[in-house]
Amino acid sequence: MRTTGFYAKYGLYDTTAREDSTLTTAYNQSFGDISKAKEDISAPDYGTLEQDYFLLDGTHPEMPDNPDDVVFFSSEMSGADGTFTENPLLIILFTENHTSACLTFHFVGDHPLEMKIRWVDGSGNYIEYASYEVDSNKFVAWKQVENYRRLEIEFTRAMPYRYVKFRYIEYGTDIICGVDGYPVKEAKLVEECDPISNKIAINKLTFKLIDEKNDFDIGNMSGIHKVFQSGQKVMAYETINGEAQLLGAFFLDSYSTTKNISTISLVDYKGLLSKHTFRGGKVYTGEPAGEVIDQIMAAAGITAYTVDEATRAAPLYGWLKIQDCRKTLREVLFACGSVIDSSRSETVNIYKPSRVIHTTIQRSRKFSTTPKNQSYISDVAVKFPVYSLDEESKEIFKSTYVPGIYTVDLSSPSAEMTITGGTITEQTNNYVTFTVAEEGEVVISGRKYSKEDLTVTASVEKVDAGESRETKSFTCTVLNASQAADRAQAILDYYDLRLNLKIKFLNEGDKVVDWAEVFNANRKFGSYVAGIEKMTTDLTGGYISTAELRGYYKLVEDFYYTGEIIAGEEFGEM
């Protein structure tokens, strides 16, 4: 019997504290290097002369004369009662304020038993203090503290005759929601990908967890919700018979709590694109799409992405105005005939889709199948602009300004701008930045681009019997005539796939964009071949998906005779 489960791993970290930290101590052995505590280096548990420390079975290597993997090895060994003559002390300094819900310590060998931590603000005032009983080599010291500039970590007791051996600190920890973590009441994943890239749909993950201790309640002033940051990364997984399958990387969008039930809403990489503005557009005359995609991703702060070579090489013609990164990327991908997808991946991937079958949905996995025909489309029209630079310079705008630095965004592209009453410091086709030394009228002039809209239409040769002509229209701002014709024909071919399927089935890693062979419940009538365009998955109710697909009917004729299989004979139980 199949068993499933869901969990999300949330990195509850102050993401800038490690790089901003400087660790110091006066209690380290000469061979220890405390600066390496900023790195998660592998440190073996060396055999030492601590009393009754290790067996002579080869599990503890001999320490070399000059080890390069020892971070902190206290200068003093604990006594018979586990205390120290002078407690080992670590001090961590920061140049900026930091906030964390906890500190995670990584020790080597026998961990200390007790420690104290003091949090200090930028003025030298102690803002929090806590004592901890350490119970593992990876120990999480929970304490929600805001705006600290200094940490003082004092080790007060260990096992008898032991050194404190510390190797790494993290300014936070992973929070698990679901399997082996906070219990999740329900979880739903909605994934969508438009194969013609007329829109970039956002994948959304929503789950409700049972918050017995009010850790996520905004009213709890010491709750871990205080370190929630919009855009923090969450890795989501589904387990099938104990084996974890990656659902994707998601980012915190919003959360709320009602009666100990916290609702966490997350978006994928495509959702991040909507939160950032792309200002680097211009008038393009054949520049490769890959360069522009790199600029869009940089503007959105996304580094984990791939772009296939065919998409990278596609030329762009037209203009990209100032707008959010998702809308900008839609223009580029529509022109390229490429899609963007992040499902079942740690990265976001951009590529030209194909109709290669990646998965098979057998009868044994299906609960229901509802086929229907989509509306008939006979014509596809694609409108695109053609820009030409005017010969003469004209006034673009004028206004009165007091001394200062200003940036003016343009509603239409211009070039070769000049100014009276100020000094231009930066200009692009989309905006101009200038400085004003004295109050007065500022006039910006330049050569404007004239625009002419053209439309290319792809049509079927003959309208199907009983149908009438129906046109679908699209617009793209970075196409030329040849590309518009190719895109119109490709979209028309897509609309020729009129079969729409709605199926409910047991998911085994199936994802949007993939093409699937869906077996018909009636074995006499072949199967369906279709691309998964949208899928909603119940992550806590059996990993059951409801998907919408578009494709065609694969008819299996009875008029074949191949090998030992004859007409009418079953050719495999699916």
Where are these regions (language model features)?
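C-terminal, active-site-flanking charged/polar segments
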Residues: 353-359, 440-442, 446-452, 520-557
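Glycine- and charge-enriched low-complexity intrinsically disordered segments
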Residues: 552-574
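N-terminal export/assembly leaders
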Residues: 293-321
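Short beta-strand/loop turn elements enriched in aromatics
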Residues: 182-208, 300, 463-496
